[in-house]
Design a protein with these regions (language model features):
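Glycine-rich phosphate-binding loops of nucleotide-dependent enzymes
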Residues: 2-319
Length: 319
């Protein structure tokens, strides 16, 4: 079974490792959700994570990003945060952001805030926007982890706070331009089309200045046109120098997008390789591609996958 088509290739040479997960295991009581899974991601690389429903893909993401503390194993990261652009310089291209050299791989603490500050960001299966905030305000929220104003300075709104607030607003607008939402700045998140809400989540994640972004089912519930636009955006993110890891059930999407693919089955790594290698492996065909399982089910929660919102986006605070 072959689903790959021609795909844009990166003009950047393969970089050094930015993420190294070794022997990650996660138990919930007597349930072994992830068992001895390892993954290395390099600079400027797109890696896909596939597997049947309940394979442990999102649980593995949660271990990488500090939401779960792995029962055993280690997650090491080499990210040094990108330097934000000066507020006076407006650009819609992330390539204009100067990047510091990566530090050596070091263990990541299992704390979401520490992971974000180290340079790793993520989105979730279900949309988690602030429904009653504008698109610009949602992205600004993501940016505040890069500000240094203390609580008292924020309350008094002193000169330092006002400078950082202005820079945050400029950067948020740049990121909206980058993801194609530059004209939606003042739109409330709850009133935006479903595909735009997904883009807005990505913009908010990019506001943390990551070196690596993890996307959990970014095309869930999208129509074919929105899926193509999501693919183009991910290539654009990759070409700006970031690394990307994507969980997705859409095989055509994942095999046309990724440089490498890891297939999980029952919490264990089954096959890792290029898209051509993975999609032609008999074990993958038997375990996932050829099963005929409903790809729209939520794999870890045992409920339906996120659907298009009818009235408003979910309003939850991200870590």
């Amino acid at each position: 079974m072959t689903v790959t088509e021609s795909r844009p290739t990166s003009t950047r040479p393969a970089g050094q490792p930015v993420l190294e997960a070794s022997g990650v295991t996660m138990r919930f009581g007597g349930l072994l959700a992830v068992n001895d899974v390892s993954l290395t991601v390099h600079e400027g690389e797109i890696v896909g994570l596939i597997g049947p429903n309940g394979a442990g893909k999102t649980t593995f993401f949660n271990c990488l990003t500090g939401l779960y503390k792995p029962t055993s194993g280690q997650v090491r990261f080499a990210g040094t945060p990108r330097k934000p652009p000066r507020a006076s310089k407006k650009t819609s291209d992330l390539e204009a952001v100067p990047v510091q050299p990566l530090e050596p791989l070091t263990p990541l603490p299992p704390k979401p805030r520490a992971v974000v500050r180290a340079g790793m960001a993520r989105t979730f299966q279900n949309i988690r926007l602030f429904a009653n905030m504008t698109a610009l305000e949602n992205v600004m929220v993501g940016r505040y982890c890069r500000t240094s104003s203390a609580a008292l300075t924020s309350v008094l709104r002193g000169p330092k706070f006002r400078r950082e607030e202005a820079a945050t607003r400029v950067r948020a607008q740049e990121l909206l331009d980058f993801v194609g939402l530059g004209k939606s700045t003042e739109h409330l998140a709850r009133n935006m089309p479903y595909g735009d809400q997904r883009r807005l989540e990505i913009a908010r994640a990019l506001a943390t200045d990551p070196k690596l972004i993890l996307l959990d089912e970014p095309t869930a519930g999208m129509n074919p046109q929105e899926t193509r636009q999501a693919s183009d955006l991910i290539f654009k993110i990759r070409d700006s120098g970031l690394s990307v890891v994507v969980i997705e059930h859409d095989m055509r999407f994942i095999f046309n997008l990724c440089d490498r693919v890891l297939c999980l089955v029952r919490g264990e790594g089954l096959v890792e390789g290029t898209p051509d290698e993975v999609q032609s492996d008999p074990r993958v065909i038997e375990a996932y591609i050829g099963t005929g399982e409903d790809d729209d089910e939520d794999e870890d929660e045992g409920t339906d996958a996120p659907q298009r919102p009818q009235d408003e986006a979910g309003e939850e605070e991200t870590p």
